[in-house]
A protein has these predicted regions:
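Conserved nucleic-acid-binding Ia/Ib motif block in the N-terminal RecA-like helicase ATPase lobe
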Residues: 5, 10-21, 69-127
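The conserved Walker
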Residues: 45-49
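Gly/Ser/Thr-rich beta-alpha loop segments that engage phosphate groups in nucleotides
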Residues: 22, 40, 50-52, 111-112
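Generic secondary-structure boundary/loop-capping signal
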Residues: 3, 33, 54-57, 82, ...
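Walker A/P-loop NTP-binding motif
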Residues: 29-41, 52-70, 87, 92-96
Length: 127
């Protein structure tokens, strides 16, 4: 199924296509419409099946559609079990949100916390 058929905005579809994807995977086709509709979802799929895009794309779209207001605050929080996965998920969010005003910040252990705190005070999506 094409990403535009899932209810994603033109700018998100463009960002996805610039990353080399034209068709959604089964997990994306099932998850994206449900998340966009505001439904809760618990999903599992094998490695490499597009799970990150399955939740990242609707999160980005929903945040883009919200009134941002004048106060900067955390809008979404994504938790991962490892620093490596946090970095990978963060990288994907940044690629997909390239046409938005969202600020995406990776936060994880093993590095100086002061810079991360500064970024947290300015950002909107964290993990």
């Amino acid at each position: 199924m094409k990403f535009i058929e899932l209810g994603l905005s033109d700018s998100l579809v463009s960002a996805v296509e610039k990353n080399g994807y034209t068709e959604s995977t089964p997990i994306q086709a099932q998850a994206i419409p449900k998340i966009l509709a505001g439904k809760n979802l618990l999903a599992a799929a094998e490695t490499g099946t597009g799970k990150t895009a399955a939740f990242a794309l609707p999160i980005i779209q929903k945040l883009n559609n919200q009134n941002q207001g004048k106060y900067k605050r955390i809008k979404a929080l994504v938790l991962t079990p490892t620093r490596e996965l946090a970095s990978q998920v963060g990288s994907n969010f940044k690629k997909y949100a390239r046409h938005s005003n969202l600020r995406i910040v990776d936060v994880y252990g093993g590095v100086k916390i002061s810079q991360q705190i500064k970024q947290l005070r300015m950002g909107q999506i964290y993990w």
